[in-house]
Amino acid sequence: MELRSVEELMDLLYACRGERPPAGPGGGPGDPHGHALRTAALLRRRRPADKELQVAGLVSPVGRLLWPGDPAARTADVVRPLLGARVARLVRRQAHPGAWVHDDDLASLRQADDEARTADFDAGVLEDWRTVLELTAARNSRLGAVD
């Protein structure tokens, strides 16, 4: 699957509402949609200029809706053409603790992800992120045209 537009990505993110993680240890947050919104909101507060980092926190639950395998790798593969290599790298490597030890971006993403599991605050709604997704996709599109 390849996302061709922010609208398609928004549809996938909306489909994550009400989705439940697999049972068992490390199954993930109880509400992946809300968790992703909280993660992105925490990153927005801490790193307001880093839209790609915020978006990486937002799109993480998408992989659970796609074919079997590693959800982080699926998400990275699906968002890369639309959102760029950096977002895909952050999403893919976030699931591997050894990868984020020496990477400040991954450490920030992981910290926000962990905090969002227990944080209880109004993180807004998904529609609040449409403009950030569009800006990130447009920036990636321009960069891709230059390559």
Predicted features and spans:
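Metal-dependent phosphohydrolase cores
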Residues: 1-147
